Amino acid sequence: SLPMKKDSINFSNIFSPNFMLRYAPGHMRNLSKNDQNFNYSDLYALNKTTEIETGLSAVLGFDYTINEKVNNKIVKEKFSASLGQVFNHERNKDIPSKSSLDQKMSDVVGNFKYNFSQIGTIDYKFSLDHNLNDLNYNEISTNLNFGKVEFNLDYLEENNHIGTEHYASSGISLNFNDYNKLSFSTKKNFKTDSTELYNLSYQYSIDCLTAGLVYRREFYQDSDLEPNNTLMFTISFVPFASVDTAFNQ
C-alpha cells in the first residue's frame, strides 16, 4: 500500500510516490518574460505561475521522510527528501522560460533537509536540467545554534535560463547574556570574486526597549570607488516604533 512505511525502535521511514494529471482548456496570456522561478514547493500547485497553465500535463515525484521516535511516538522530522518533474503534452511559449515549465519536460526540482537534533538544520534546494547534466539552481542554507553562539551560512548559484547570481553570505552572533548580543556578517560575490559588504553590530535589549549600534562597510564593483562606511544607531520600542540614525563616510 502507499505510502510505504517502515518502523524501527527509534525511527519511522515513510516513502510517498506522487502522481498528478491535470488539464486546463483555453488560452493563457503571454507571461514568457516574467521573472518566475520554479521549485519543489510549486510542483503540485494548480497554478505554478501567476496564472493556471493551459494544456495537458502530468507531475511525477516523491517524498521521503525519516522521523525520530521516543516511546513509540514521533517527536520530530530528522531528514526529508523531495523530488519531482513536470511533463507537458506540448510546449507552451506563454509560460515564463525562466521556470522551464514552457518545455515538454521541466527541470527536475528537489529539496533536502536535515535536522541536527538540538543545534539546527541544513536545507538544500536544487533545479536540475531535464538532460540531467546541468545544475541550473543550487541553494544551501544552514542555521546552527550552540547556545551562546549562533551561526548561519547561505550559498546560491544560478545558471542558464534561471539567472547568473552566485554568492555566499554568512553570519555569527555571540549572545553574552539575555541583554547583550554582538553580531558579524559578510557576503562574497563569486561573479566578481569580491567581498560586497561587512556588517558588525551590537544590540542591547531589555523589556520593550532594544538599542543597537551597527557598522556597515559596503564595497563597489568599480575598484576606483572608495568603500562606503555607515555607522548607524538604532532604538526600538516594541511593539511601537523604531528610530534609526545613520552617519555615512
Q: Language-model segments: what does each one mean?
A:
Residues 1-249:
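Outer-membrane beta-barrel translocator/pore domains, especially the C-terminal barrels
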